[in-house]
Regions:
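Single conserved hydrophobic/aromatic residue that forms the stacking wall/gate
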Residues: 113-122
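Nucleotidyltransferase catalytic core that binds NTPs
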Residues: 1-114
Length: 122
């Protein structure tokens, strides 16, 4: 019997606030790529922009409420629990430790390309 290797994506952002475009993009990503789970990861301390106006715990609570009835989308608090800046590379490494060597995908919201030069270890 073969072992199932889950297909996983990370969707990071400040989610300040979470809105329908975030949700629609995550659902479309999951469906189009036949993913098992999309980890929606609110940035605690985004290093490439100013701090969000809403606190991390409140943004996480809003995200959890928004995802409550959406299978395959998970509110992931790993960046909020981590001290220091919220580097996507660190989050991907953490997901790799959790899942092993299965598929990894990174989805970034559409405006990330504008700040790409400021993103750690590109």
């Amino acid at each position: 019997m073969s072992e199932h290797n889950p297909r996983v994506a990370m969707f990071g952002g400040t989610f300040n606030p979470i809105h329908i475009a975030h949700l629609r993009a995550a659902v479309e990503l999951r469906e189009a790529l036949s993913l098992d789970v999309v980890h929606m990861v609110p940035a605690h301390l985004p290093p490439h922009r100013s701090a969000p106006g809403v606190g991390s715990d409140d943004r996480l609570s809003m995200l959890r409420l928004a995802l409550a009835d959406t299978p395959g989308l998970v509110a992931d608090d790993r960046e909020i629990r981590r001290d220091g800046p919220s580097w996507s590379l660190d989050t991907l490494k953490s997901l790799r430790e959790q899942y092993g060597d299965q598929t990894r995908l990174l989805m970034a919201v559409s405006y990330t390309h504008l700040t790409l030069p400021t993103i750690y270890s590109v």
